[in-house]
Design a protein with these regions (language model features):
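C-terminal motif of bacterial Sec signal peptides marking the signal peptidase cleavage site
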Residues: 16-19
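Bacterial N-terminal signal peptides that target proteins for export
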Residues: 1-9
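Catalytic glycan-binding domains that act on GlcNAc-containing polysaccharides
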Residues: 22-206
Length: 206
């Protein structure tokens, strides 16, 4: 391959990698769902699709992603202390990964249940569809109302069985976190509702 063609190929590859990369949103964007979803319109479409499919409010989905991963599609739980005189990395406390911090076993259940066999935990679209599916299931099993954001997050963390049994009652830190998620979900829902940039355009023109 000649040098000009090689440089051209390299430039094309770099451009493709750049286009595929997802930049983690800034703190200002995370604070405002309107700005966040206007700048990431594919995320808005994914949230809307999941909401229509499963009934999970978009604000709740977004608040769970923020709490679980801070919008980092490759997030994992922090490792424990290093072992063997610091020569070996510590273990992670769970298999949680991706935007939704879904566990491997629960993710496999989601793929089998929905038929979405190619779903990836680092995909925002797949992650919010997972959240919608999970919220719908735990809502039905635990009798949680659609807009009871606090209860939904507690069930997301503890599972439907744990929520019904009240395992969360002994975890003050979790109740505080659920209150925070509920407040953010309500703010996100309001911001999305009043965001002019996200409203359908007439004939795609106005």
């Amino acid at each position: 391959m000649s040098r000009p063609l090689l440089f051209s190929a390299l430039a094309g590859a770099l451009a493709l990698l750049s286009a595929c990369a997802t930049t983690q949103p800034s703190a200002d964007q995370i604070a405002d769902a309107c700005d966040l979803l206007t700048d990431n319109h594919d995320w808005y479409k994914a949230l809307r699709h999941s909401s229509k499919e499963w009934g999970a409010p978009m604000g709740l989905q977004l608040a769970i992603v923020n709490q679980e991963s801070s919008f980092d599609g490759h997030a994992r739980p922090a490792r424990g202390p290093r072992k063997f005189f610091g020569l070996v990395q510590g273990d992670r406390p769970s298999t949680a990964y991706g935007y939704a911090q879904a566990l491997e076993t629960t993710w496999e259940q989601y793929k089998k249940s929905t038929g979405n066999r190619g779903a990836d935990r680092h995909s925002f679209r797949d992650s919010v569809d997972f959240i919608g599916w999970y919220v719908n299931n735990t809502g039905l099993q635990a009798g949680v109302g659609q807009y009871d954001y606090k209860a939904h997050y507690l069930a997301y963390h503890e599972g439907a069985g744990g929520y019904v049994q009240g395992t969360w009652r002994r975890k003050t830190w979790l109740v505080q976190r659920a209150n925070h998620v509920a407040g953010q979900a309500a703010r996100y829902e309001s911001q999305i509702k009043h965001c002019k940039a996200l409203r359908p355009k007439f004939l795609g023109i106005f």
